[in-house]
């Protein structure tokens, strides 16, 4: 701890050791320590050191702690600034990532939909393949069952074949034994036979029966060559009747297989098949199977010739087979001699002939064939015929000879009977097996067919369900299309409401559409939150103005404690507050400054202990608020008066003597001398204090000569006069979007000089909107005023007269049809949907009027009725119809250039004009009694001209209202008459004119483009709608840049070519999408852009769209008027204009700033920012550095034109006007004029300059000067040097200060301020 050292003389040395070793104390703590030291010194001098002995250590500790806290606070502030910058960068990165995520989500939704569609298709294919697989499995199962049955049948047939083969072998052996016995009998009885030949012939026949005992048991089939029992006639007949009664038919292969299994075969019968009985006739006739089998019904129609042919062919086959078997038998006998004896017997007996004969039965009903037993070689048919036709003696002969072989006949007959029974049983079994197998095969076939039919039925049902769903969808679509067509044909008032539409007919949304709706809803929510934030921020600023006590937290508790302790009697006077110098930085576009200012102001406002009163109810609160305002303005006045280092002239705060070296030498720039002089400041309307100003525009009379106006054809434009290249202010151009006089050559219009200073000002009350016309040379005199409509008029623009340099009416079609690949046939131009009229613009009006479906706008008459479909509808003043149509083929009267190709899909917008009001038909002279006696009538109107001859080909004024109405009035005569009017889709926010095209910006993000007709008058019945994007946002501002139009759309700027209606370029004016472009001002090669709720102005190149410069006006305003007073810490730009070689800036708190435009800008580091292209700079060697020199157009040989000038500006040369408004500056308007008769330049000179040698030069320079009048409008008026209260007392005259004032004082009414500025045109 430091102690106090006392010397003999009573001197005190305080902190002597700490000054050498301690750290540097802050300025505030050192001031406090010095004050405390002097106070302690006085106490010690008056009393004794004992008084401060115990107090001194405590004070030292407090001061040390205060110093440490201040240092920590400064460190925390630095860290806070760094964190805020990081936070802003993170916010920007977050917005970027958020946008990327939205894009990714959209793509994901699209991919998901595509995958679902593909998955559905694959699922359908899988189901189809499964169905086919089930069918194939069923077929394979049926085939496997058939194969197994066929294998079983094959095994059974093999077994039967083996049994038959064994039986055949036994029969051959028996036959051989019979042959041997017969030979032995023949050898033994040879002598007897030779003795009597007739007797032998008679006894041979019974012998033949005894020798062949099996003849009646086994017979051979004539056709197939297989053994068939002879007594099977009953079986064949019954089987035939069974098959004919059941009408059953089996396939050929199954019949052949059953025939093989039902008959016994010999080894010699290879490749043959047994016959199946197919006829119900009771006979033993069979049909060979080597021929093609016929159905059951076909056998009755077979002719006898076919049967004879088959019998002959079969007989030859049987002969061959019999000879073969006989040869085999002869081989088995072993002796040719023995066989020769047998052959002699067979040859001598005609009944044993081998060849069969076909003969008829006795009844003659059916033919019978002889059955030849090939194994025995006996013709049984001839024997049977002989026995059947012979008498009883033959039978007796047989009986007599039967005892020759008695010992063998019993055994043969028994064997024959057994074989016959066995064969019958086998035949029955085989027949039953055949029927069973046939039935099983048929059942299998039918079951397979049933499964296939079931599958086909299921597929048909699925297809039926799909088709039914498709039919339902098509029916719903048809109903929806019909309802849309009916709705489109009806009037808007007859549209069907959504609750009347059935649920089945309502539209069903897909996932993509639902996602789009959700995204739009989120965007609307963001915009709503943004608007709420802006409203809350505005209310806070207004509350900060009305309640300064909320922000006044100046002294801490320690200060209050010490002030009560040491200065209880009286408070010391406040010390003069020193303001640090403000450095102006030109930085890249960022929103960090705005965020810091907003957070700082919110912290200040939220520091109040009581809630803010936005809506006071009683008069006491109003008077208290007025007193608080006066106190605030008084503080601003003190700050302005105490601000040293700047000059004050003509109501402007000028910078100190600032000399800027021009590029060609070291002479001083004379622009600083041309200070605007305020010439007028009064309320616009004295009688109505509630009138509010909205917008204004000067009358542009370029290209119009009143002495050449014709009542039928309109005024003829001046040849060679271009509205975009002529002198705007010399001819009355007021708009900030039009060029200033310094960038164009002067063109004189003597007829229009007297009236080019007229200004139309739009005012509004609670119920109506009015137009107040004044002359800027005499701003105190109202030329005329009239009511426009009941809604607020948001914008106004002066449109010049028709000119030869205007675009022809048909150019917008010709340019769009020249390059089809550029414009596209689908009506989309550069990502923007193009909508236009369906009729060609070059068709004369007489041709257009012949169409019954297109209303015709009669521009010259006041009594116009709306026509629709040939019927007059007087109750409907204006209608709007929109229909998507294809541009029709041009008729014979149209030019050939329009028949290149079909036009794009366009939107034909046609309207009927609103009937003119009855009051508008009165001449302007009749309304002279409504105004003062000093009202000046227009001098350009001829005395003999009637109100009916006013044409829109002359200069006009276009007014856009909030309810979507667009009004066109004449700018030269009969102002009250509305020439044209049209109802657009949304509010009209901005109007510009480019070479015969008027672009109207709407609040729904679309541009309406109007053009003139063939007679030079404006055609509002046909126009084009240009959509700038989705989702829709308002187009807040537009500016004409050469022959292009810059549109402020959200945070972007779209450069539009009005001739081709295409977007040539789009760029971001601000990195954050929530920000909006609000004002645009163009001159030369530069365009100044302002952003909503931002204090930074941005300069862009007019051709390359390069970002050139940033200027922040907030530090300048805070330095001039004091930080934190009246909410001036938050500065937003509300008005912007380039006029008189100056950039005029109006802020939201009523401050007017004028910044001279310079060719070069020297930054705070000495860096040169810009150069004139046709001049040489002494610092051109440094131009290679980045940001050193901006490339511009032009060369040494070319003349000085506007395209070689970039409007840089420096806040070091900025000038602040002490005349301002209480609320936001609504508008700036510049018109030519000269209120002051002579302008004495010595008034504007600085005190240090002498008038001696420079006076002749100033006089010579004054002859080249041009004069312009700049008007500003806003609510209220204030002089920052005087403050609030004193001016009211002066204006009210001799009156008591305490008397009750009206609710709205004179200083709070809407004011206009007029400055006259002199400048040297380029």
From Swiss-Prot:
Segments for region (JNK-binding domain (JBD)): 210-226
Coiled-coil intervals: 66-167, 443-534
Subcellular location: Cytoplasm; Golgi apparatus; Cytoplasmic vesicle; Cell projection, Growth cone
Positions with biased composition (Basic and acidic residues): 724-750
Matching SUPFAM superfamilies: WD40 repeat-like (SSF50978)
Span list, region Disordered: 183-211, 245-317, 704-754, 844-952, 1281-1307
Biased composition (Polar residues): 271-282, 914-937
Bias type Basic residues, positions: 305-315
Low complexity bias (residue ranges): 261-270, 941-952
GO CC field: axolemma; axon; axon cytoplasm; cell body; cytoplasm; cytoplasmic vesicle; dendrite; Golgi membrane
Region (Kinesin-binding domain (KBD)): 50-80
Top-rank taxon: Eukaryota
Residue numbers of Phosphoserine PTMs: 315, 365-366, 588, 662
Compositional bias annotation for Acidic residues: 1285-1294
Region (Interaction with NTRK2), start-end ranges: 459-515
Summary of subunit composition and partner proteins: Forms homo- or heterooligomeric complexes. The central region of MAPK8IP3 interacts with the C-terminal of MAPK8IP2 but not MAPK8IP1. Binds specific components of the JNK signaling pathway namely MAPK8/JNK1, MAPK9/JNK2 and MAPK10/JNK3 to the N-terminal region, MAP2K4/MKK4 and MAP2K7/MKK7 to the central region and MAP3K11 to the C-terminal region. Binds the TPR motif-containing C-terminal of kinesin light chain, KLC1. Pre-assembled MAPK8IP1 scaffolding complexes are then transported as a cargo of kinesin, to the required subcellular location.
Protein's UniProt name: C-Jun-amino-terminal kinase-interacting protein 3
Organism: Rattus norvegicus
């Amino acid at each position: 701890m430091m102690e106090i050292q006392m010397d003999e003389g009573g001197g005190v040395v305080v902190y002597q050791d700490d000054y050498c070793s301690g750290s540097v104390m802050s300025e505030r703590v050192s001031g406090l320590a010095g004050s405390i030291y002097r106070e302690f010194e006085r106490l010690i001098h008056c009393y004794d050191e004992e008084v401060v002995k115990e107090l001194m250590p405590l004070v030292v500790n407090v001061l040390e702690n205060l110093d440490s806290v201040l240092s920590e606070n400064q460190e925390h502030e630095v860290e806070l600034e760094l964190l805020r910058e990081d936070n802003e960068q993170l916010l920007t990165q977050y917005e970027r990532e958020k946008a990327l995520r939205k894009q990714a989500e959209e793509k994901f939704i699209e991919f998901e939909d595509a995958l679902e569609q593909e998955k559905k298709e694959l699922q359908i294919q899988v189901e189809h393949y499964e169905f086919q697989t089930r069918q194939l499995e069923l077929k394979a199962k049926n085939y496997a069952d058939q194969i197994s049955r066929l294998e079983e049948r094959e095994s059974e047939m093999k077994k039967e074949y083996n049994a038959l083969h064994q039986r055949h072998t036994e029969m051959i052996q028996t036959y051989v034994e019979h042959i041997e016995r017969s030979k032995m009998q023949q050898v033994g009885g040879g002598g007897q036979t030779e003795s009597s030949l007739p007797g032998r012939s008679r006894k041979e026949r019974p012998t033949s029966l005894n020798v062949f005992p099996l003849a009646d048991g086994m017979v051979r089939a004539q056709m197939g060559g297989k053994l068939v029992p002879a007594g099977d006639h009953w079986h064949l007949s019954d089987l035939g009747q069974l098959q004919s009664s059941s009408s059953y038919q089996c396939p050929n292969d199954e019949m052949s297989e059953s025939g093989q299994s039902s008959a016994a075969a010999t080894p010699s019968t290879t490749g043959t098949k047994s016959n199946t009985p197919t006829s119900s006739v009771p006979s033993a006739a069979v049909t060979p199977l080597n021929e093609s089998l016929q159905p059951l019904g076909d056998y009755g129609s077979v002719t006898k010739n076919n049967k004879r042919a088959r019998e002959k062919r079969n007989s030859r086959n049987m002969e061959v087979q019999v000879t073969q078997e006989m040869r085999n038998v002869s081989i088995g006998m072993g002796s040719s001699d023995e066989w020769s004896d047998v052959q002699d017997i067979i040859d001598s007996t005609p009944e044993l002939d081998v060849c069969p004969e076909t003969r008829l039965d006795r009844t003659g009903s059916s033919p019978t064939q002889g059955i030849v037993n090939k194994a025995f070689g006996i013709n049984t048919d001839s024997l049977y015929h002989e026995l059947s036709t012979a008498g009883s003696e033959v039978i007796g002969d047989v009986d007599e000879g039967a005892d020759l072989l008695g010992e063998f006949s019993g055994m043969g007959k028994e064997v024959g009977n057994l074989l016959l029974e066995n064969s019958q049983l086998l035949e029955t079994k085989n027949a039953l097996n055949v029927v069973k197998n046939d039935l099983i095969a048929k059942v299998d076939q039918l079951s397979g067919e049933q499964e296939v039919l079931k599958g086909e039925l299921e597929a048909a049902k699925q297809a039926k369900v799909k088709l039914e769903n498709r039919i339902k969808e098509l029916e719903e679509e048809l109903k929806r299309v019909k309802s849309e067509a009916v709705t489109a044909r009806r009037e808007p008032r007859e549209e069907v409401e959504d609750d009347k539409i059935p649920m089945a007919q309502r539209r069903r949304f897909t996932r993509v559409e639902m996602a789009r709706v959700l995204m739009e809803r989120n965007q609307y929510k963001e915009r709503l939150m943004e608007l709420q934030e802006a409203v809350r921020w505005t209310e806070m600023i207004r509350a900060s103005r009305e309640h300064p006590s909320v922000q006044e937290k100046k002294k801490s508790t320690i200060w209050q404690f010490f002030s009560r302790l040491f200065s209880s009697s009286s408070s010391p006077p406040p010390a003069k507050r020193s303001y640090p110098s403000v450095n102006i930085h030109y930085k890249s576009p960022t929103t960090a400054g705005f965020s810091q200012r907003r957070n700082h102001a919110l912290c200040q406002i939220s520091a109040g202990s009581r809630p803010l009163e936005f809506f006071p109810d009683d008069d006491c609160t109003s008077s208290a608020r007025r007193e608080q305002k006066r106190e605030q303005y008084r503080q601003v006045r003190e700050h302005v008066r105490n601000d040293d280092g700047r000059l004050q002239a003509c109501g402007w705060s000028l910078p100190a003597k600032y000399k800027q070296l021009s590029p060609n030498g070291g002479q001083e720039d004379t622009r600083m001398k041309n200070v605007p002089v305020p010439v007028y400041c009064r309320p616009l309307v004295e009688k109505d204090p509630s009138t509010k100003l909205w917008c204004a525009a000067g009358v542009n009379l370029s290209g119009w000569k009143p002495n050449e106006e014709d009542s039928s054809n309109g005024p003829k434009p001046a040849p060679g006069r271009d509205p975009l290249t002529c002198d705007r202010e010399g001819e009355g151009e007021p708009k900030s979007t039009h060029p200033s006089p310094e960038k164009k050559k002067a063109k004189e219009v003597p007829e229009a000089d007297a009236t080019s200073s007229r200004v139309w000002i739009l005012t509004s009350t609670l119920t109506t909107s009015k137009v107040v016309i004044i002359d800027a040379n005499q701003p105190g005199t109202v030329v005329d005023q009239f009511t426009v409509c009941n809604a607020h008029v948001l914008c106004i623009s002066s449109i010049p007269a028709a000119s030869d340099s205007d675009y022809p009416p048909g150019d917008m079609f010709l340019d769009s049809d020249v390059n089809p690949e550029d414009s596209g046939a689908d009506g989309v131009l550069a990502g923007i949907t193009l909508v236009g009229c369906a009729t060609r613009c070059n068709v004369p009006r007489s041709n257009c009027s012949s169409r019954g479906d297109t209303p015709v706008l009669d521009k010259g008459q006041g009594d116009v009725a709306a026509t629709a479909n040939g019927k007059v509808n007087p109750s409907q003043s204006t209608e709007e119809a929109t229909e998507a149509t294809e541009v029709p083929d041009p008729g014979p009267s149209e030019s050939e250039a329009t028949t290149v190709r079909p036009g794009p899909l366009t939107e034909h917008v046609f309207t009927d004009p609103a009937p003119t009001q009855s009051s508008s038909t009165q001449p302007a002279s009749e309304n002279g009694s409504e105004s003062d006696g000093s009202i000046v009538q227009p001098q350009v109107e001829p005395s003999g001209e009637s109100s009916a001859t006013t044409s829109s080909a002359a200069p006009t004024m276009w007014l856009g209202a909030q309810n979507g109405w667009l009004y066109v009035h004449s700018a030269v005569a009969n102002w009250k008459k509305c020439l044209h009017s049209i109802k657009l889709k949304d509010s009209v926010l901005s109007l510009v004119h480019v070479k015969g095209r008027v672009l109207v910006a709407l609040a729904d993000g679309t541009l309406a483009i109007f053009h003139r007709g063939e007679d030079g008058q404006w055609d509002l019945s046909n126009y084009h709608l240009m959509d700038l994007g989705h989702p829709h946002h308002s187009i807040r501002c537009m500016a004409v840049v050469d022959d292009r139009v810059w549109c402020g759309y959200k945070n972007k700027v779209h450069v539009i070519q009005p001739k081709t209606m295409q977007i040539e370029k789009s760029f971001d004016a601000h990195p954050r999408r929530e920000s909006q472009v609000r004002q645009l001002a163009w001159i030369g090669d530069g365009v100044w852009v302002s952003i909503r709720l931002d204090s930074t102005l941005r300069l862009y190149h007019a051709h390359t769209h390069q970002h050139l410069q940033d200027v922040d006006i907030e530090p300048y305003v805070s330095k001039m008027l004091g930080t934190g007073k009246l909410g001036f810490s938050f500065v937003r730009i509300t008005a912007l204009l380039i006029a008189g070689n100056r950039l005029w800036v109006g802020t939201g708190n009523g401050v007017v700033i004028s910044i001279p435009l310079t060719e070069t800008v020297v930054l705070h580091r000495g860096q040169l920012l810009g150069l004139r292209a046709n001049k040489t700079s002494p610092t051109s060697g440094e131009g290679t550095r980045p940001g050193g020199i901006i490339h511009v157009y032009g060369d040494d040989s070319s003349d000085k034109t506007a395209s070689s000038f970039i409007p840089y500006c420096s806040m070091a040369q900025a000038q602040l006007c002490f005349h301002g408004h209480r609320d936001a500056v609504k508008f700036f308007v510049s018109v030519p004029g000269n209120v002051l008769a002579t302008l004495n330049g010595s008034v504007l000179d600085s005190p240090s300059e002498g008038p001696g040698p420079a006076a002749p030069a100033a006089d010579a320079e004054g002859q080249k000067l041009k004069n312009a009048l700049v008007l500003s409008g806003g609510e209220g008026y204030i002089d920052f040097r005087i403050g609030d209260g004193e001016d009211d007392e002066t204006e009210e005259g001799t009156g008591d200060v305490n008397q009750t004032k009206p609710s709205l004082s004179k200083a709070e009414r809407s004011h206009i301020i007029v400055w006259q500025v002199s400048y040297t045109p380029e």
